[in-house]
């Protein structure tokens, strides 16, 4: 086993973190990075250098909100485990790698992600999946506001976000493509509705599936609510199975619940505001 430390600027304090090098233990193509008290720049520098040096599994311990973990990684086959709380923009711009968080994740997970997979064994914050263009994100618990905003798809690149708990306002806002799933089976807020208000506001592409009941008053004027049909369930099943496998849950029990489909009624909901009809 090799212990090493990345080079860092002179010792100092930034936002409550010491500018210290993370302690790295490496064995073959796997490495553990202790990031206790380490600033996000030092952590991400260490991850990038390890991946460039042939490491395929990076285990991050002591995470306490350091942001940009896995951001910009374009190396398929690389896996990052985060033990603790993953900070803002985890997996941002990621293209092919996998990030698994054993804890909660803050805002912006999967921001503009192109491919790869993110698994969060906990809750996630706001703007989850912002502008995603591909890849898959699975969150075991509750999620925040504006989840799936501006998700988009192109040809075979179809982003997927599956949330096991409940969501707040503006779920699926301005969606242009992709698949957004809300299961409501793992939540800290059993007394609250599955989704907040303005669900699908401005949505003009893609589809949302919610396990349970969604009322018209909860949705934007740009979407319609229908019962999920057999074709919808055939799309849902493999996603629910992947979710269940990731978190050790029962896919059949989840699929037994009623699902509704939320989809746009127009692909140009605001055309009359900026173009002649």
Where are these regions (language model features)?
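Long, distal/terminal scaffolding or interaction modules
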Residues: 1-277
